A protein has these predicted regions:
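Rossmann-like flavin
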Residues: 66-71, 134, 142, 159
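Short, solvent-exposed loop/turn segments at secondary-structure junctions
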Residues: 40-41, 69-71, 152
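N-terminal Rossmann-like FAD-binding beta1-loop-alpha1 element of flavoenzymes
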Residues: 26-63
Length: 171
């Protein structure tokens, strides 16, 4: 576990000061990782961090800011009959951890639709079903994201402002 006051060069590159147009987010919160936007890639990253023993033991602090008021994935492309263009095995977690509770198949199981999905002739979900899966996973990660946050600036912190009592020769 790294000491909370020690910052490596890589840490300093990822420590950011965020100013938001909303006052619901602290103006000067410090994170090890701050994600701007909360689409499928950042959703998958936030899940991976939550499930990471190493990140949890190191008290790795991450958060994500999303401009929209809720999770959405290409809402304009939810056309009737449209199908996902990739394998559902490329969901948010399966390639990293097939036993994760955030998998597409766990989503189907928890909604009582796994058997029906497996028995379908076509093993590719509709875009509507995939969107529902992503939203389900995002709701389970609500504490990792602040919605309705319009980020207006990002400024790197200096070593002195990130850890005033740290030695300047850390870099």
């Amino acid at each position: 576990m790294r000491p909370s006051h020690a910052h490596s060069y890589a840490d300093l590159l990822s420590i950011l000061q965020v100013s938001s147009s909303h006052t619901t987010v602290p103006k000067e919160e410090i994170y090890d990782l701050l994600g701007i936007g909360y689409g499928p890639a950042h959703l998958a990253l936030s899940i991976a961090l939550r499930e990471s023993t190493e990140a949890n033991e190191a008290n790795f602090k991450s958060h994500f800011l999303e401009k929209r008021g809720h999770f959405a994935w290409h809402p304009a492309l939810l056309l009737p009959g449209s199908q996902l263009q990739v394998s559902p095995l490329k969901d948010l977690v399966t390639l990293r951890d097939p036993t994760s509770t955030y998998s597409f198949y766990n989503y189907l199981h928890s909604h009582g639709r796994l058997a029906r999905y497996i028995n379908k002739e076509q093993g590719v979900p509709s875009r509507r079903e995939w969107t529902s899966y992503l939203a389900w996973a995002a709701r389970r990660m609500n504490d990792a994201v602040s919605y309705g946050q319009d980020v207006v600036s990002i400024e790197p912190l200096t070593l002195a402002s990130a850890a005033p009592d740290a030695k300047q020769d850390v870099l």
